[in-house]
Structure formats: C-alpha cells, structure tokens
Amino acid sequence: MGFAEKNLYDFRFLLFISIILSCSISASATIAEANALLKWKSTFTNSSKLSSWVHDANTNTSFSCTSWYGVSCNSRGSIEELNLTNTGIEGTFQDFPFISLSNLAYVDLSMNLLSGTIPPQFGNLSKLIYFDLSTNHLTGEISPSLGNLKNLTVLYLHQNYLTSVIPSELGNMESMTDLALSQNKLTGSIPSSLGNLKNLMVLYLYENYLTGVIPPELGNMESMTDLALSQNKLTGSIPSTLGNLKNLMVLYLYENYLTGVIPPEIGNMESMTNLALSQNKLTGSIPSSLGNLKNLTLLSLFQNYLTGGIPPKLGNIESMIDLELSNNKLTGSIPSSLGNLKNLTILYLYENYLTGVIPPELGNMESMIDLQLNNNKLTGSIPSSFGNLKNLTYLYLYLNYLTGVIPQELGNMESMINLDLSQNKLTGSVPDSFGNFTKLESLYLRVNHLSGAIPPGVANSSHLTTLILDTNNFTGFFPETVCKGRKLQNISLDYNHLEGPIPKSLRDCKSLIRARFLGNKFTGDIFEAFGIYPDLNFIDFSHNKFHGEISSNWEKSPKLGALIMSNNNITGAIPTEIWNMTQLVELDLSTNNLFGELPEAIGNLTNLSRLRLNGNQLSGRVPAGLSFLTNLESLDLSSNNFSSEIPQTFDSFLKLHDMNLSRNKFDGSIPRLSKLTQLTQLDLSHNQLDGEIPSQLSSLQSLDKLDLSHNNLSGLIPTTFEGMIALTNVDISNNKLEGPLPDTPTFRKATADALEENIGLCSNIPKQRLKPCRELKKPKKNGNLVVWILVPILGVLVILSICANTFTYCIRKRKLQNGRNTDPETGENMSIFSVDGKFKYQDIIESTNEFDPTHLIGTGGYSKVYRANLQDTIIAVKRLHDTIDEEISKPVVKQEFLNEVKALTEIRHRNVVKLFGFCSHRRHTFLIYEYMEKGSLNKLLANDEEAKRLTWTKRINVVKGVAHALSYMHHDRITPIVHRDISSGNILLDNDYTAKISDFGTAKLLKTDSSNWSAVAGTYGYVAPEFAYTMKVTEKCDVYSFGVLILELIIGKHPGDLVSSLSSSPGEALSLRSISDERVLEPRGQNREKLLKMVEMALLCLQANPESRPTMLSISTTFS
C-alpha cells in the first residue's frame, strides 16, 4: 500500500468514526431533551392535550419530533420549537429544562394557565427568535436578562399580572420587531432606551400603570407602524418627535393624563390610519395639519379640553370612517366640509360649545350610522337633508336650541333605532312619516313645544322599548298600539294635555319597567286601566282624572318600588293587598277620596321611605304598626280625619326629614320626638292637641319649619327653644300659649299672623301686635287677702332684685376687667373677649407653643391658623398678620372691630363655624374658632383619595348645608350679614362631613388693604361680575359664589372658564355626565336627580344680572 493510499484510508476511517459519534451524540441529546420535557410535563395539573408526549426513560431509543404535539426539531434532531398555545396546561416554570433545551428558537406558550414568575434563565436561550407567554397568569417582574436575547424579534408578554418596571435592558434587543407588554400591572416610566430599537414595528404597552412622560426618543424608531400606550397614567406632553415616524399607522395614547397641545408635527405621519388621543387633558386647538393625514380612518380626540373651532381641512380626509371630537370645549360652527366625508359612519361632536346651524351638507354622508350633535348651542332647524341618511341608526340632537318643525323627511331614515330630539325648542306636530321607523327602539322628544295629536305610526315599531314624550303640549288620545311589540319598557307622557283612557295594549304590556303619566287629563276606571307587570319598578299616574277603586292586583307586580296615584278621583278603601308590597319605597295615594282606617299591617312596608296619604277621608287611630317604618324620610297624613293621640312610638323615625299631621282630629299632648334629629319640617297644625309644648322638641337641631297653630296648646314656650339654631319658620297662632317669646332671631322676626290668638303671649316688638312683656296685671279691688299675700312676696322680690343687680354689676365689672386684661409676664394691657370666658390667653399661647409652625394647619391672605389642644377641647386659633394687627390697633377701627366680633359670636347655626372670641395683645392678635377635623373643602377635593371618600350623598349635603347657612345669615338675622368670600377654601367639614362656613363676616373686617373695607371682596374665580364696576357687595354676590361652589363640588375642581360662559349664557345646557367628578362613581337614582336640580340652580345663581339670581331663602327652601 502506498503512502497516498494509506492516508486516504485513514481519512475515510476517521470520517466514518466521526459520523458514528455524531449520530450517537445527537441521539443522546434528543433523548435527554425528551426526558427533560417529560419531567416538566409531570408538574402540570392538566396536560390532556399532551398525550402524545410518551417515551420510555429506561431505553436509549430516540423519539420522533413529529409525533409529539407542539414540538419541532432542527435537522439534527434537537428541539428548536415549542408551540403549546391554548392547550390548557396549568403549571409553572420552576422545572422548565433550560439547559436541555438550549437550541430553542421558537416558544409559544400563550393562552394557558401558567402561573408564577418568568425565570431569568430564559435570557440564556441565545437562539430564541420568537417568545410568546401572553394570556396566562404570570406574576412578578420582567427579568432584565431578556435584554441578552440579541436575536429575538418577537416578545409577547401581554395579558398577565406582571408587576414592577419595564427593564431598560430591553432596549438592547436590536433585532426586535414586535414588543407587547400590555394588559399587565407594570409601573414606573417607559425606558428611553426603547428608542434604540430601530427595527421595532409594534410596541404595545397599553393597560398598565405606567407613569412619567412619553420619552422623546421613541421618535427614533423609524420602522414603527403600531404604537399603543393607552390606558396608563402617563403625564406631560405628546413629544413632537413622534412626527418623525413616517411609517406609523396606529397611534393610541388615549386614557392617560397627557397635557399640553397636540403637536402639529403629527400631521407629518402620512401613513397614519388610526389616531386616538381621547380621554386626556389636552388643551389648545385641533391642528389643521391633521387634514394632511389622507389615509386616516379613525380620529378620536374626545374628552379633552380642546378649544377653538373644528378645522375645515378635516373634511378633506375622504378615507375617514370614525370622527370623535366630543366632550371638549370646541366653539364656532360645524364646518360644511364634513359633508364631503362619504365614508364616515360615526360623527361625535356632542358636549361642546358649538354654535350656528347644522349644515345641510351633513345629509350627504350616505354611510353615516351614528350621528351625535347633542349638548351644544346649535340653533336653527333640523336639516331636511338628513332624510338622505338611509343607514343612520342613531341620531342625537338633544340639549340644543333647535327651533322649527321636525322635517317629514326624517321618516325616510328607515334604519333608525334611537332618535333623541329632546330639550330643544321644536314646535309643530310629530310627522306621520315616523310610522316608517319599523326598527325603532327608542324615541325621545321630551321638553320641547310640540303639539297636536301623537300619530299612531309612532308605535308601529315592534322593537319599541323606550318612548319619552313628556313636557310638551300634546293633545288628544294616545295611540292604542303603543305596546304592539310587547317590548315597551319605559314610557313617559307626563305634563302634556292627553286625554281619554289609557290604551288597552298598556294593560297587557308585561314588559313595562317604568311608566309616567302624571299631569294629563287621562280618564277611566283605575281598577281596569292597569294590569299585572312582572318587572315594573315605578309608575306615576298622578294629577289626572281617573276614578274607581284601587285594584288589589298591584300586589302581583313584585318589583314595584314606587306607586304614585295622587290627585285623582279614586274612591273606596285601600286594599289590604297593598300592605303586603314589602318592596315599596314610595307610596303616594294623596288627594283622592279614599276612606277607612289604616291597618296594623302597614308596618309590613319596612322599605318605605316616602308615605303620602294626605288629602283623603281616612279616619280612626294611627296604627302603632306605622312605627315599624324606620326607613321613612317623608310622612304626610294631613287633611284626613285621623283621631285620638299621636303615637308616642313616632320617635322611631330616625331618618325622617319632614312630617305633616296637620288638619286632622288628633288630641292629647304632643309626643316626645326628641330622637328625630334629622327632622327639618314638622306640621301638627289644625288639630285638637292640648297641654304644654314639650321642651324635648328643642332637641330637633335640624328643624327648620315648625307649625303648631290652631290647637289648644297652653303654658309657656320652653326657653330651650333658644337653642334651636336651624329654626327659621315658626307658627304657633291660635292656641292658649302665654309668657314671652324665646329670644331668637326666628321668634323676633315672626309675623303677627304666626302669633295671633294667644291671649297670654307677650312681646316688646310692636309689629307682632302682642301685649308688652313688661306689663303687669293690676290686682282686683277689695283684695285684702291678696294684699297680705302679695306684699311679702313683692318685698322678697325687691330684695332679690337688688341682690341680682349687684351680682350682675360685679360680673360686668369682672368682664370689663377681662376685656382690659394684664399679661402675667409683662404686665402689659391686652383686650380679650370670649363668649363664655372659658378660653384663657395663656392656655392658648402654651398649647400652640407660642404659635410654633408645628401647630400650623392653614395659611390665608390675612392670617395663619393653628390647632390648639386645650385640656378638654380642641380649637382653631386664627392669628392675624402684623399689617392687620396694626390696622386694628387704631382706636376707631378697634372699637368697630370689637363690636362686629361680639355680634358674630352670637351666631348660632349648625352650618356656621362657631366664633368663640377674640384677643388683642401687643404681641399677638387672634380669633378663636371651633375646630373642624376634616379641614377645608378645597383641600379634600385636591386630594384624590379624600375626593373619593366625598361621595355624591356627602357633596349634596354640603350644598344643602351651605345653602341653609347663607339663608340664615341673609334672611333670619335682624341685621343681614353678607359673607363676601364664599369659596371652597372657606367651607370646612367635621368628622361627619357636615359642612360649615367659616370667616362669616370677618372677611369684611379683616380686608384692610384699602381705606374702604368694602373695596375688596372675595376669592378670585368666585367674585360676582358686577363687583368689578359697582364695588358694592350684596347678598347676590354670595349667591353667585354659591353657584360656583355647586359646580366645583360636582366637577371636583374649580369650574374655571365654564363659569364666565354660563354667566353670559343663562340658557346654557350642561350634561351631568360630562362634568361630574370621575373619581366618584357615576351618580344614580335619587342622587342623580338631586344633582341635576343642583346644576339647574347653579345656572340660575351664575346669571350675569344679579336681580335675576334667586335669593338664598328660595334656594334653601328648594333644597329642603
């Protein structure tokens, strides 16, 4: 064998050996990988779809990749792909074979039940190209080690429960094209290093808790096509660098806290198809450059603070399908160019300040499905061209100022499902063409000036669920076929002039949930007019002309919560079945001709909050069972024939606000009602009550109106009535009362009519036409026995009078000395006045550590407020600034100031912060107030957590409390007091969230930056507009400020520019949904109704003409 032949032989032998070895190693590797996977599988709770994963671990035979579900191998037999998406596996990565599967390039474990953390060892799989763990239950952090995967192109971790921050190391994955971390619980900021990912096309970070700004470096990702950062907590402005992303097609930044303007550079992104910046805090105008985005199909900018007009250039984007600009502050008219958008299906411009007419060109948008222009200031008529919109299913034009008739052409919109034209000024009749709406589900025409008969065609649709036609001038009979489709749920016909019987189809309309017929001329037998309604929860057919007896079938409507049939001609006894309707919350049968007695079974209605049976012929005793209705808030049994005593158990109505038992035949004494601490109105007049007025009535600290007139009450009026600080209206006439009136503003202002026919009452106020209290009765003649009795008594009285005068002189002298006291340390004089003398100067100085900053709780324009912990109480001490102190030290000013402060200490109202006293010293001058634990309203509203605790119920009570306090100060004082500075900073709350006004009257006293103290009044943003030119402060200035305060409570912050626009436009329409504080759950039920009433009141208060504003008395009465 030659040398060459020998070498060739050796080479072939070595090659053969290497192939044998290679095959052996490969086989060993695949077996090891298989065994490793089987070990991981054994940890799964559920692995039914992996039944093909079978291998005998005791043999060395290889396994076939193709036979294992979801497993693929490379050419050498090593596992490189693991695709187990949606296989239902439930387990963790604790035993995942990272070392054995080092060749993995593709991993898809999405849509399973994997839990636990993502191990950092995944960062060692250097060949990984595709990695998807989305839609699992994974927790913990995203490991920074993933940044080592230089070849990774796709990373999907979305829809898990991952926390912590996004690692900046992810910016090292230079091959990355798709990165989805959305729908987790990630926090922290977006790493600027992501801007290094030049190949990144898709970045999804939406639905997390990310904060901070959007990094400008994201504008470097030139390959980007989809960028979604929505539904986070991002702040700051939108970087103008995003305009560099020429390939970007989708930009979602909605539902963040972004501020600033929309960068005009966004108009450079010519590939853009979907742009959503809605639900942020963006300001400024809509850039006209957006009109350059020729491929745009979606433009969503709603719920921001955008101003200015709608750019006409938007009408050039012919590809536009969805345009949403609602809930902003846009002004001007709707551009007619929008009519060019032939492909537009959705146009939302609602809740702005748009004016002018609706362009007829909008009728050219043939693809339109949903058109909402409501809550604006649009005028003119509804364009007849809307009849061309054959595909339109939703048309909302409500809350505008539209006039004229409803065009017949609207009936051509045969696809219509929901039509709302309510709260405009439309006239004429409802077009007959509405009968073409065969798909109609909801029709709202309420609060217009529509008249004539309601056409039968309105009820043609078998899909009709909601028909709201109230507050118009409709006449005639109502269409018989109203419930033709048996789907009608909500019908409201109230406040029209409809007549005749209720349609028979309504009697059998089992689908009804809510029905209102009040304020019409409907007739017929009430027993036959209505049927049985399984789902009905509210019905009101009051103020009509129904007759007959109440049907017992109402018991068979198991969900009925409110049954209201007042002011009809209903007769007979109340059926016993009514008392079995335990779900009732409101029962109003008032002003009919019902008779009979109330049974004990009335106590079954334990959910009842409002019971009105007044104006009937009911008789007998009031049953004791009534006292079981502990949820009652309003009770009216007046104008009946009830007799016997008022039950003593009435003190169980702890939630009761008003009770009227007047015009009956009740006798006996007034029961003890001391537990009814929420009672605001009590009317027991026109009965046969006798005995004395119980002193316990003075416990009713919320009582605002008390009428005890036309009874047989005798004796003195309890002196404890002087503590009833909320009482503003009293009538005790036509009784047998005697003695002096209580010394309160309410009794001093009481009219002669409210006091007359009480022969023993006395008063020194001439207008009350009572005998003077100083008058003594002369003894009758020949009264020797009387003389012998009276002389010793009068002698004793004279001696006692002398002693009393002497004692009073001493006390006054001590108080005078207290008024000019001496500092125990310096011997210097100081002036101190305290209403009860219990606050000592030295105690206050010591408790505040001589006004150390650690005790500071607030700072104002003229003072600092400190908390002082005294031995038995906590007080607030308002220390005046030195400039104020110097002004007050002037003799003339000081005396006037002291007189005013002393007057203010006499104020007693539960919604006014109590001023205890005042101290003037060379070193310190301060006022002493009661301490309010929750602090000021503005601080609560500025704190998100505190604002959430300030529920709608609490906010409503704040409005009521402030209204009652202002009414008291304006109308119930002998000398009215104007606050001058009503603002959220001057409304304080205690631990129970009871609102009290602070600085009442002191605003005038302490503003001394002008020789005329009236020259400055109020806090910026709350001052009435007329003050700028009159420089006069009146009660109507407080009313204006109160209107601002209402809006502030509803919005959750100062209403800003909205105030001036409402002041200049008294007819302004406001949507509660658009302005209500989003930190509190959306108001519902009674709270929503109360808030709507308060918004209406705020609009009245903000009228530019002060004479057009209501008085605080009328406001307070409305809210009572």
UniProtKB/Swiss-Prot annotation:
LRR repeats lie at residues 78-100, 103-125, 127-150, 151-172, 175-198, 199-221, 223-246, 247-269, 271-294, 295-317, 319-342, 343-365, 367-389, 391-412, 415-437, 439-461, 463-484, 487-510, 535-557, 559-581, 583-605, 607-630, 631-652, 655-677, 678-701, 702-723, 726-748. Keywords: ATP-binding, Glycoprotein, Kinase, Leucine-rich repeat, Membrane, Nucleotide-binding, Phosphoprotein, Receptor, Repeat, Serine/threonine-protein kinase, Signal, Transferase, Transmembrane, Transmembrane helix. It is a single-pass type I membrane protein. Residues 1-29 form the signal peptide. One of its GO terms (molecular function) is protein serine/threonine kinase activity. The modification Phosphotyrosine is found at residues 929, 968, 1022, 1029. The active site is at 981 (proton acceptor). GO terms for cellular component: membrane. The chain crosses the membrane at residues 784-804. Belongs to the protein kinase superfamily. Ser/Thr protein kinase family. This is Probable leucine-rich repeat receptor-like protein kinase At1g35710.
